[in-house]
Amino acid sequence: MARTTDNEHSGHRERMRKKFIENGFDVFETHEALEMFLYYAIPRKDTNPLAHRLLDRYITVGGVCDAPIDELMKEFGLSENAAALLKMLPEMARLYTESKMSHDNIIDYENLGKIFKAKFIGRTNECVALMLGDAKGKMIYFDII
């Protein structure tokens, strides 16, 4: 027999998941989006207070994702898996953005800024990107060196 509860949080994650599936993060407050993202690393704990604390400290989701792993673990009690998941977010965004770019390999000035910008998403250390092209404007090589 199913247990009934008067817990106000009962079904909260499912409601949030449905809200996301129907609308994406456009209808979420920033703390709600972070709270939901944390569900996947912290499956049995209310992640709302943690999302608020992280945003109070780091101001933005970008700030949270750029925070040092050891700091996230020590100061917020995150497991290494939870901290690593946050660090993966910008890296996955970069991979996603790069994969959506035109693959015709023709360099044009209109897209050059977008191409370079995408390559630097999620990078926290100084780095250099090298793009090589031929005389016809075809990209031969583009990567972080």
Question: Which role does the model predict for each range below?
Answer:
Residues M1, E91-R94:
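N-terminal presequences and immediately downstream first alpha-helices
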Residues R53, E71, L85-M88, I115:
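Generic beta-strand or strand-like secondary-structure segments
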